[in-house]
């Protein structure tokens, strides 16, 4: 959706103990503040409990400063982002964003030119719109974009040379052109906003990725997602994902996106190697390496074995992935795992057909039809249910 969050999560490179933080004078105006870098780095490393304590300490020391409230909400945002299918953290995030907005509003009543209050309110409203967009509440998300734009422009007036604020402008310029094309329902709202400029938005994000102080990593993330999901260019997305994963090797989201993009480019050896590590970390319970990500990893590991005609190995991966799907909930929608459960069963059925186990194959195709469709999964399952799968020889 219209993603106008300004200084998000991607700050800093060195973590520090919670006891090292002090809140006095914490601001995003002016020079680099290592306290911000230290705390936000905990978020990107998915050290959520430690990040909570870090920013709660800031809030306790200076409750009228919106910085602590905003970044505590960012911990909540990453709890959501790491597994978007899990909505159990949504209400907590909305509450944290509301609290941040309220703190900013109190400051703005005293000083309408308060840079931090303007900036953090814009960021909080932007994140609220971002989540609403991810939940397909497109009109409400667009309205948040409408509320956010004046705050974005005002912060730019107050800090015209700040590269990190350029991040918000880049996001706006890109999505203000692209989103109405994809979601016509938001066009009436967009009528009241300035026109977007897709190319300018990309140029601005590139500038932040090169020269940003706090928003550099977030600019890299958006550039990767834009090229993957909106531009359809996995090759252009990959360098950003490699850089992010190398910066934060324990971040499961960057880990999986890098692996998935490598496979999309046909670089199976590298991609499967990364997915094997995803599976190991998932089995070990490492933060961020959840069941849906584990199913995704096993699907690609199994598909690689299927490609190589290592059918027994493929069956092992697919069977484990399917069993994990059942642990996600009682309903087929809950078991879908972003469509990977359907693909797992489709390829498991195809593998069983190659092994001459027709009854097992049919059960798998029936399971595909019971799950939400992913791509052409239902069409293929119906076809293979009628006629056994046979690999086309080249």
Q: What do the PLM-derived regions correspond to, one by one?
A:
Residues 69-72, 118-121, 125, 166-169, ...:
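TPR/Sel1-like alpha-solenoid repeat signature
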Residues 60, 102, 149-153, 209-210, ...:
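Amphipathic alpha-helical segments of tetratricopeptide repeats
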Residues 29-35, 181-184, 212-220, 248-257, ...:
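Generic helix N-cap/helix-start motif at coil->alpha-helix transitions
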Residues 65, 114, 162, 215-216, ...:
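Residue-level recognition of tetratricopeptide repeat
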Residues 23-37, 42-55, 64, 72-161, ...:
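Short coil/linker segments at helix-helix boundaries
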Residues 149-156, 193-197, 202, 279-280, ...:
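TPR/TPR-like (Sel1-like) alpha-helical repeat modules
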Residues 78-89, 130, 176-184, 232-235, ...:
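Alpha-helical linker/edge segments of TPR/alpha-solenoid repeat scaffolds
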């Amino acid at each position: 959706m219209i993603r106008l969050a300004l200084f998000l999560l991607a700050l800093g490179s060195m973590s520090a103990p919670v006891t090292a933080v002090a809140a006095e004078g914490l601001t995003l105006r002016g020079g680099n503040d290592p306290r911000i870098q230290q705390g936000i780095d905990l978020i990107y490393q998915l050290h959520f409990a430690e990040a909570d304590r870090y920013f709660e300490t800031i809030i306790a020391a200076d409750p009228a400063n919106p910085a602590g409230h905003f970044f505590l909400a960012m911990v909540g945002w990453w709890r959501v982002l790491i597994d978007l299918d899990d909505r159990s953290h949504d209400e907590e995030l909305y509450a944290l964003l509301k609290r941040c907005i309220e703190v900013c509003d109190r400051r703005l009543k005293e000083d309408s030119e308060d840079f931090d209050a303007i900036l953090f309110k814009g960021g909080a409203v932007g994140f609220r719109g971002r989540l609403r967009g991810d939940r397909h509440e497109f009109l409400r998300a667009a309205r948040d974009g409408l509320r956010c734009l004046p705050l974005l422009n005002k912060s730019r007036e107050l800090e015209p040379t700040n590269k990190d604020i350029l991040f918000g402008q880049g996001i706006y310029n890109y999505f203000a052109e692209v989103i109405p094309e994809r979601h016509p329902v938001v066009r009436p709202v967009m009528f009241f906003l300035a026109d977007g400029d897709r190319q300018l938005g990309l140029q601005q994000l590139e500038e932040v990725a090169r020269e940003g102080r706090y928003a550099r990593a977030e600019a890299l993330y958006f550039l990767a997602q834009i090229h993957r999901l909106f531009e359809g260019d996995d090759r252009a997305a990959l360098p950003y994902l490699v850089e992010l994963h190398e910066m934060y090797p324990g971040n499961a989201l960057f880990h999986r996106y890098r692996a998935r993009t490598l496979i999309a480019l046909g670089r199976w050896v590298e991609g499967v190697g990364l997915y094997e590590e995803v599976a190991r970390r998932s089995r070990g319970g490492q933060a961020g390496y959840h069941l849906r990500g584990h199913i995704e990893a096993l699907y690609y590991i199994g598909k690689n074995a299927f490609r190589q005609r290592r059918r027994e190995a493929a069956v092992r991966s697919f069977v484990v992935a399917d069993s994990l799907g059942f642990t996600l909930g009682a309903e087929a929608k809950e078991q879908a795992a972003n469509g990977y459960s359907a693909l797992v069963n489709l390829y498991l059925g195809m593998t069983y057909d190659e092994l001459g186990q027709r009854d097992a194959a049919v059960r798998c195709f029936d399971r595909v039809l019971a799950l939400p469709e992913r791509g052409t999964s239902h069409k293929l399952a119906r076809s293979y249910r009628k006629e056994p799968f046979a690999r086309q020889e080249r």
